[in-house]
């Protein structure tokens, strides 16, 4: 009987810990909007160069993407 009470207690504590870890604060991520850069010229090869041009345009960052390798600027919607 003692062993089964310990086992039940241990299982109950593990269950409570498992449930408590999933109930933490939830952070909400902002959506990301994209727009093609107006000032970037040529084929986009360097993502850091694209990001610098996008920063000068007032965006948060930028990435090279697509088959034609264009620079797309990103910002929070």
Curated annotation (Swiss-Prot):
It is found in: Secreted. Broadly expressed. Gene3D superfamilies: Knottin, scorpion toxin-like. Residues 1-30 form the signal peptide. One of its GO terms (biological process) is killing of cells of another organism. GO terms for cellular component: extracellular region; mitochondrion; plant-type cell wall; plasma membrane. This is Defensin-like protein 2. It comes from Arabidopsis thaliana (Mouse-ear cress). The gene is PDF2.2.
């Amino acid at each position: 009987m003692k062993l089964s009470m310990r086992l039940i207690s241990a299982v109950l504590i593990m269950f409570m810990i498992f449930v408590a870890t999933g109930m933490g604060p939830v952070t909400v991520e902002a959506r990301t909007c994209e727009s093609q850069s107006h000032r970037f010229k040529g084929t986009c090869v360097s993502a850091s160069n694209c990001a610098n041009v996008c920063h000068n345009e007032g965006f948060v960052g930028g990435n090279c993407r697509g088959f034609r390798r264009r620079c797309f600027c990103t910002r929070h919607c």
